[in-house]
UniProtKB/Swiss-Prot annotation:
Residues found modified as Phosphoserine: 2
Gene name for this UniProt entry: Tnnt1
Protein name per UniProt: Troponin T, slow skeletal muscle
Organism of origin: Mus musculus
InterPro entries (UniProt xref): TNNT (IPR027707), Troponin (IPR001978), Troponin_sf (IPR038077)
GO BP, one annotated term: negative regulation of muscle contraction
Biased composition (Basic and acidic residues): 32-41, 109-149
GO-annotated molecular function: tropomyosin binding; troponin T binding
Organismal lineage: Eukaryota, Metazoa, Chordata, Craniata, Vertebrata
Region: Disordered, residue numbers: 1-62, 109-153
Pro residues: bias regions: 43-55
Keywords recorded for this protein, A-Z: Muscle protein, Phosphoprotein
Compositional bias (Acidic residues): 1-31
Alphabetized Pfam families for the sequence: Troponin
Amino acid sequence: MSDTEEQEYEEEQAEDEEAVEEEEAPEEPEPVAEREEERPKPSRPVVPPLIPPKIPEGERVDFDDIHRKRMEKDLLELQTLIDVHFEQRKKEEEELIALKDRIERRRAERAEQQRFRTEKERERQAKLAEEKMRKEEEEAKKRAEDDAKKKKVLSNMGAHFGGYLVKAEQKRGKRQTGREMKLRILSERKKPLNIDYMGEDQLREKAQELSEWIHQLESEKFDLMEKLKQQKYEINVLYNRISHAQKFRKGAGKGRVGGRWK
């Protein structure tokens, strides 16, 4: 508090004390006649004026110090809020950077997986094309051999019909050995499925590969069944021709005797 304010405050206190002393001073006695004539008035309670507490002389209120402390407190709170804000922002930036890193890593992993699938699919297609070409070459070669055998059988049908029957019997025996060979090949082709270590994408890829393999096997089975039907039909035709030719040969070899021997 400044000196001027302190002086004004002391003057106000002095005036208030004088007013209280005037109110408390005893009134002069009035004449008896006047008091009798006047009617008594109800007494009103005297309310003492509000007097601010006196501040001791040795202590003074330093408003500048209070204002300074309040400013320091507000500044400290503001600095705390700023620090919290920047810490939160730093944390969010770190999380954003980590998220970007995860996205980039996953994108790279997906690209690598896609590249691996593409390369594997390319190898599979090349293998299928090579296998198809090899089968076509084998079928063409086998078809040429079958045609040569058919021509040879037809040319030697009359003289070697018995040998053909023997070959047919041998083919029947070979069918039994072919069954054993088929079982052996199936046992060799049948491989265990090790799918315990595979993930979801690998299982999906394995299922797709098995589905395509089954489709290919069904197609090969259909082709082989059609080929077997054709071969059976050709064998039946040749067998009928041989049987027909054999009947004519047997009829030509027998002689009919006419008349009676005496």
